[in-house]
C-alpha cells in the first residue's frame, strides 16, 4: 500500500516537473531545423525514422500493404519504446531504493517533457494572433507549422481559423493524451503515444502514397485519442 502511494506521488511530481520544465525551456523551433537540439528531439527522430523505413513496407497488393502498414507502425513504436522500458526497468531494479527514485524521476521528467508541447505552441499562437491583428500575413505564415492546411493561399481570417483549429487539436495531441498515457502506462506509455501520434502525422493520410501503409497508424491514433478527445470536447 505504501509503495503504491509512493509511486503515485512520484508520478504526480514527474508530471508537474515535466510541465514546469516545458514552460521554462519550451521546444526547439522547426524554424531552425539545423540546430542539434531540433535534430535530436524524439519526435523529429521518430518522423525521420518513419520516413526512411516506409519504402520497405510498400507492396503492389493493397491487402499485403495494409498488413505491412501494421508492421511499420509496430516497428516504429517498439524501436523507440524498448530502450526506454529496458533502461528504466534496469534503473528501478539494480539501483538501490531511494537512489533509484531520484535517478528514475530525473530521467522520467526529461522524457515526459519531450512528449508534451505547451510553451512553444503558446508562443506561436500569441505571435500569430499579433501578426493577424496587424494584418501582417507574411509574418502569420511563418507559423504555418500550426496547421496541416496549405497556408500559401490562406488569408488572415483563414489563418486565424487554422491556428484555433490546430490549438484545439494539439490540446489533445501534445498535452492531454501524452499526460494521460503517462498516468496510465508510465513513461513508456507516453513515448508510445508520441510515436503513434508521429506516425499518424507522417503516414496517416488517405493519399495514394499512404492509404495502405498508413491506415493502421491513423486508426491507432484515433483509438488512443478517443477518451482524451471526448474530455477535451467537454472542456471546450
Where are these regions (language model features)?
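Glycine-rich phosphate/dinucleotide-binding loop and adjoining beta-alpha-beta core of small-molecule
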Residues: 201
